[in-house]
Amino acid sequence: MADLEVYKNLSPEKVERCMSVMQSGTQMIKLKRGTKGLVRLFYLDEHRTRLRWRPSRKSEKAKILIDSIYKVTEGRQSEIFHRQAEGNFDPSCCFTIYHGNHMESLDLITSNPEEARTWITGLKYLMAGISDEDSLAKRQRTHDQWVKQTFEEADKNGDGLLNIEEIHQLMHKLNVNLPRRKVRQMFQEADTDENQGTLTFEEFCVFYKMMSLRRDLYLLLLSYSDKKDHLTVEELAQFLKVEQKMNNVTTDYCLDIIKKFEVSEENKVKNVLGIEGFTNFMRSPACDIFNPLHHEVYQDMDQPLCNYYIASSHNTYLTGDQLLSQSKVDMYARVLQEGCRCVEVDCWDGPDGEPVVHHGYTLTSKILFRDVVETINKHAFVKNEFPVILSIENHCSIQQQRKIAQYLKGIFGDKLDLSSVDTGECKQLPSPQSLKGKILVKGKKLPYHLGDDAEEGEVSDEDSADEIEDECKFKLHYSNGTTEHQVESFIRKKLESLLKESQIRDKEDPDSFTVRALLKATHEGLNAHLKQSPDVKESGKKSHGRSLMTNFGKHKKTTKSRSKSYSTDDEEDTQQSTGKEGGQLYRLGRRRKTMKLCRELSDLVVYTNSVAAQDIVDDGTTGNVLSFSETRAHQVVQQKSEQFMIYNQKQLTRIYPSAYRIDSSNFNPLPYWNAGCQLVALNYQSEGRMMQLNRAKFKANGNCGYVLKPQQMCKGTFNPFSGDPLPANPKKQLILKVISGQQLPKPPDSMFGDRGEIIDPFVEVEIIGLPVDCCKDQTRVVDDNGFNPVWEETLTFTVHMPEIALVRFLVWDHDPIGRDFVGQRTVTFSSLVPGYRHVYLEGLTEASIFVHITINEIYGKWSPLILNPSYTILHFLGATKNRQLQGLKGLFNKNPRHSSSENNSHYVRKRSIGDRILRRTASAPAKGRKKSKMGFQEMVEIKDSVSEATRDQDGVLRRTTRSLQARPVSMPVDRNLLGALSLPVSETAKDIEGKENSLAEDKDGRRKGKASIKDPHFLNFNKKLSSSSSALLHKDTSQGDTIVSTAHMSVTGEQLGMSSPRGGRTTSNATSNCQENPCPSKSLSPKQHLAPDPVVNPTQDLHGVKIKEKGNPEDFVEGKSILSGSVLSHSNLEIKNLEGNRGKGRAATSFSLSDVSMLCSDIPDLHSTAILQESVISHLIDNVTLTNENEPGSSISALIGQFDETNNQALTVVSHLHNTSVMSGHCPLPSLGLKMPIKHGFCKGKSKSSFLCSSPELIALSSSETTKHATNTVYETTCTPISKTKPDDDLSSKAKTAALESNLPGSPNTSRGWLPKSPTKGEDWETLKSCSPASSPDLTLEDVIADPTLCFNSGESSLVEIDGESENLSLTTCEYRREGTSQLASPLKLKYNQGVVEHFQRGLRNGYCKETLRPSVPEIFNNIQDVKTQSISYLAYQGAGFVHNHFSDSDAKMFQTCVPQQSSAQDMHVPVPKQLAHLPLPALKLPSPCKSKSLGDLTSEDIACNFESKYQCISKSFVTTGIRDKKGVTVKTKSLEPIDALTEQLRKLVSFDQEDNCQVLYSKQDANQLPRALVRKLSSRSQSRVRNIASRAKEKQEANKQKVPNPSNGAGVVLRNKPSAPTPAVNRHSTGSYIAGYLKNTKGGGLEGRGIPEGACTALHYGHVDQFCSDNSVLQTEPSSDDKPEIYFLLRL
């Protein structure tokens, strides 16, 4: 480019003269190969960005971007000119433009020399300007050009104006899906001149700005500007420091940004940055994802050559395929300037004694060796000074070898002189720094045993050209008189069809391994063709050609098991030995060839002596370069990886593509980089995935062609295939929040072009590196919006060796039948910059995605529990040591598949078409789908050696679940939190055993459970786990040990983390104990209170065994997270038939969500380590879920105006899926003195920030799945007094498990909860639906599951259509029921609940009950004051709008905005919990931890009901002196609600007179008016079975009804008459269950001796906790006034 310098200094007059001539157009002759010249009018477009011509049949393609012009040459220099006879054209009228990746040439002839001179000058001037401009200027220029071009293309009639119809068409083309009225409104606002109804270009610019206002950036600006519409210098500096993690931010730097990017002159004067300037800044290279410092060389360049990866090219001279393409010297210039440092020259004897360069035995064109050397000399060091390696493949005679040596010395001169190079210590290669400006010749060297006087000698002739088998070589002499032209046309025809097919299939297909084994096919076809007589009939040729095509197919990889070599190239395999004989591994079966080499050429080879790849034995000589074809190299990597790595620490290795890649496709370089190979040679002329990876790898370090290998690869032993390759080193955690996309185009190969449908984009992020790091994950699909889609999703990855990892962003257009590639960008992990960044897609002008990046370091073995959501529990159970655990057959199992369905739960199956069609926005490769491991060719090729099971075990490829991340990704990790992790031994043996038998089987023994544990790995794991934790079972529960169990992610991968508060002491903060108690031995089993009976199975889904979708064994619901290790609170559970169920291996206990909740409550803590000090903006973006992407203002409006966040308030912004009004407000939850604000979360989706509010009371939380709209669950925390009964009283007596030791009123912590301020995402509130009762003794999981209300947020529509992957707990749980696996749903409950929840849901969705009933907030809170044993179902809140409007500014009455009217059967009285904890929880994608029978499998033993008697039996543990006296008092309610008998028992036991001022939240409504659409109807079979069960149970109860109630009996009493009472009770669960116990007499320590269910609360005034509560408000406990008897069913599952 040096010659362009001259053109930068041309006088403006001359430049303008050139430009005007070029823009007005010039008639020239365009020469084409094999045709006569065509006369065309060539002109420069008005933006001076494109050279165009007309007429042209393909007007769209008749253009050349100035940016893509590589060089312009004068005269007749190109090959096409050379083919023309001398004298045909005047050389001074000729010039050639080289452009594009393949160096295509456009050969032009003008009518006179003057015109040619003008064009050459003008083009070179434009090229010089482009080459000189900085990246910012270029970005601005290309943007301006793009807008102008867009305007012109939209202006169909060419009048320079756009009317509304043209605007609508443009919107479709730009993938904008806005309502027409909105477009018209913006159009009218922009149309300001007198010419109404049309837009000029200036007006269009205004319109375009309005249309493309970045809501995400606007929110970002607001959050840092204190809600102003601009940033001051100080605010900008704060943003750069806090969010963008920039150091040394000075005032001058900020002023410079304002000066450079601000558009408004007024703002510039005030030194503030408005939204337009801020947008320009954020879209500039300064905020690109790639670290700008890495545009320069920044690595240490003084290490030996073998410590670097070196950018290498294969058959550099070719412009296309390996058989027929043109060879051009310009390719050398191009690749050298692209940063390539090792080029290949194939030398052959040429005519006239001149060696030529071409691909031997093929029909590629020839170029002179001398021209090649001159080009290399000219361009080698233009871009950088680091050494160039010239890989000479020598096939010449001795005479021409001497000519080669002569040219090299004569042209390169001193560049070949290596005498001055300092090699450092002995036997070490020199460094790139010491070789600057030098050219190394890589070639054969005469053996040392020859004397120095020997002029020539024999050397082996093993090289890539000779990989072509002799019978496949094209000899250019033909016995039957066939001409070369005939042969060439025959081959060309075959090859073109082949290449076309190859291109079609080469779209990012991980299994595609482009053409191979084709030379032979071609050769056979050729011979058959040649055997025919030259005058063979046309028809004969045709049919023959057709039959030959079968040989030309591009074959999918069909590797068998890894026990065979990986290679799919059968032909090559036959040439290679099996490798059984040591040392002979790579010796080819054929004879070794030799050739003569002259001394002159041998002497030029110094540090790069090519040796035949016989074996990787280091003979002690430095300077040997081993050359392998990809297939041979693959065998070495696979079978001798550690030896190979050690060899590569001292010597160079070059890997080149297989000779069967005749289409010049590229192999995957990754396995060879991982093995330490330095020179991995690719076909630079072939664009595609592999070249993109190569470009990304070398772009770092200033694109100088040398990238330092990680130190572990440079010394010592290192096994790249290990599951934990660097156990002692910290790992990196990448938390990547994909926020939005901008101007994503339609797919390049879209059938209808711009007229095609608006795209439905999603983003896939892939980590490419060591096998253990390779994985990918993706966002959900956004429908119909390519212009500004918003995903707001967080993906988390853990990387063991970030130095070699690449991060690849892919944008796809989702399609029911597949997906179309839109664009990509690949960046090295080490070049990522934290903060808010734009990822510009390669080769697309405006298209980008906006992300937030956080990179944390993870230290120590246990740290993945906290920070890395992708660790499986297996890693911690020592799977690496006990390989038999997963049937490991040794480290290198030869199974090539990514995973196999039989032995790996990670197996990703292809989805059926029907399945895909159902998944739209909830949808597509939706977020619910797990990260597929190594779903690309790389991994297959490299990891053939590692069995999938091994990988899972070792924690490899484990990233199947979404991030645990709960904080804005900008948050630094607080390392202090890492200290107190405990061992994850909290599951008990019982949990495990139950798990094994968790399948519900119907009478025929058919499996109904969707989560069968087939995998023996799980069973082994279970046993191991149980043994490790069973010891914990027998602790005396009366000590009040706090049990908090580990909830870990499913096998799909994630560890939620765990905590183990210390036993035997009162804790005010369940989670804080986690930090205080580092002693793992104190970790109590979640079920320590259980007797060691195998019947209890709370953690059945511990591993997240997948639930299959109905009827389709192929489709897994790939649960992202699983709520497991749940604590079963026996206070809520009645264990009925332990013995009977033990036999069946069933869980005999009904499972309360609270138990789960409790369990999970601590989990976040661990994660929280990653999350301290939130940055406001992350909250913002986190909080605003732009659900309705099509409404430009929707999210902003949701956020702005609700920004008054105080320390004691949590901002809640709700942007609802169902387009209900978006409300937000402040949650009146003051921060209660915390030692450390820990955030925790496992919100995989968007929700990131929320605090666990763990009060002295029990923390209970339920797991909810984050849908595409992340959800944070809200928990209620209640204080449970611990039962003092003896541990052996009864199983139930141990029920206090999950309860924290209560802080009774006298205790100092009584009133203190742990509730830091926590912005939560809007949708996080919606999780309430799934996280119903926080510690509810009465709401069992069945309530959640059976209650469609929970599904409010699931999918975007009715349950029926939702695919299992939609990640809502509510959805999923409902799905279980739908599928007949209702995990704990009582059939009758189902029936009762149906109406309510559906109605409830509809009410919420339609918002029709805004004003139904509005008790004052204080009243509602009053009702809470005295609740002792109760947890509130947040469902009710949700329904009540409490959550939705959480005290929004606009709605002080608030609590009722969305209260649906309920039927009489559903009077939900909703007490409000003392505190809300917002905890993003992994969802219950997997079956609930306590497994139940499916509805069809219930038997009469499972249900006990009594329609007449009073409470028949009470669990002994609940009865204490305080209760016995009150036992007669009963509570009435108005409805025939399906109430949990157990709850009812509790309620009866602990209930006291209610006071009178509580209002009913739900008014009556006829049950039969309730909508029922969302609930699965029971089949007639199920209904009859339920009736049968009920009747049998009734008979049984009748028989027993005279018996005296036995307090310790586990049977359920199901009916009692209710005394009348004046007002309805507020104690009703949202599911209809009563909440046990309105304890009035608890002001003192009276509760000490009583066993209260785990959700119990002491009587506290709420004033100190909630601003909405008056200090003296007390919970009312009046019974309800309806005399109808109530029927209860108690399920024993």
Swiss-Prot record:
Annotated Pfam families: C2, EF-hand_like, PH_12, PI-PLC-X, PI-PLC-Y
Stretches with biased composition (Basic residues): 553-563
Name the UniProt record assigns to this protein: 1-phosphatidylinositol 4,5-bisphosphate phosphodiesterase eta-1
Record localization: Cytoplasm; Membrane
Residues holding substrate: K442, K444, S627, R654
Any one Gene Ontology cellular component term annotated for this protein: cytoplasm
Chain positions recorded as Ca(2+) 2 binding sites: N315, E344, D346, E393
Residues where Ca(2+) 1 binds: D155, N157, D159, E166
Chief localization: cytoplasm
